[in-house]
Amino acid sequence: MRSALLVAVAGLAAACGTTGGDNAATAPAKSPKKQRGCPSALVRVAVMNGDTHRPVKNATVGIGRAVHRTNVRGFVWHRLKCRRSVPVRVSAKGYLGKVARPPFKQRRRVVVRVYRKALQWTMYGATPERTQAHEHIAIRPPFRVAWSRGLGSLIEFPAVVSEGYAYIGNMYGAIRALRMRDGKVAWRRNLRQKMASSLAIHGDKLVVHTMRGRVWVLKRSNGKVLWSKYVGSPIESSPIVRYGIDYFGTHNGRVYALDLERRRFRWVRGGNCKITSSVAISGRTLFLGDYCGRVLALNGRSGRTIWVRGVNGRVYGTPAVLGPRLFVPSSTGGSLTAFSTRGRYLWRVNTGSYVYSSPAAWGGRVFFGSYNGRMYAVGASSGRVLWTVRTGGRISGAVVVVSGVAYAGTRRRIVGADARSGRVLLRFPHGDYVPVSGNGRRLLLHGFSRIWAVDPKRRR
């Protein structure tokens, strides 16, 4: 009887414990502990221009379902229900979009850097027309060296640059991603195949051509090989990607249009003359030269020949298009020849020595170098030589124009001259092939096997 009474009392106590007013608060006792484990937080996101370090106002910032606009200081504030890393989507007019995962758990105030599209250098020649001229970067001599990095062996073609990183390969196919801020190597990928061309940036991918006749596509963030395609002949032509199609020529004389999404050829144009020239694009027309001394104009969609014209020798370098004119270098002809983009002959400048240099076209002028050691400035419409500058050695690579300064590279020297007057503004004690690339923050000067990142010197 006594034991039964104790059981009944215990049962009544248990029932009261689950329903009684004083004890009801103990049921959700664990819930506040969960909140303490992931508390809410007011966080600040600052959107900055990655090249200039200036705030980006009126940028759209998406955090979860919420959408904000940055103020004049580039800030947005947002209350997170749970303080943890979440995707932040940033877009702004003229800038490359970005998705980041800032460490909100560690910091309440974070910075997301975005980059103006016009200040990147995503292909050899700077533009689809291969003008070798960057009109938006405003960096001029005198310079100070910010950092330098050895690359192990010959670098014949320049780095491409996007979103704070430079991508460059050496002669033996070792590709590096270098942080523009300090030159730190972000990753390295050794393809173990010789290279004689620049890379091209296509979204989050890198397109690479090698002398073993293979096209490689790498993941830009870590250098992982995504896929490759064999074409059967060495590729010295630097890639150019338009609407997802990579256009290039090969040593066996063929021209390819490779669809990078479908991983198959859109078309292939046969030929029997060696091609080292890269493709220049204007509108829907492709332009390139070959070792038979011809310049070809092809339809980009079909590969159909639009017209063919001859110059006075082999075409090693890459043509440049400026408006309605096409400028074609000839190595063995020692000349630069101008045509209209419809194929009409306009003029020719003879130098008396090899012209391997690809021309730069800017401001109504054309700039190129010769094995005679001179850099030339020529009127684009008249063909009249406006000035020449002695560089002290043979010029093999392209002339490049940035912010009104024309640069040419020779053995152990880069010379920069005012594009209007020809006055020499820079004599840098390193150089070899193509001298310059860069972004809106700094320029990269290219030597034989090392690059130097330079900033403008502050004038006192």
At which residue positions do the language-model features occur?
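Repeat-blade elements of multi-bladed beta-propeller folds
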Residues: 45, 61, 65, 120-128, ...
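Short, acidic Ser/Thr/Gly-rich low-complexity loop/linker segments typical of extracellular
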Residues: 55, 62-77
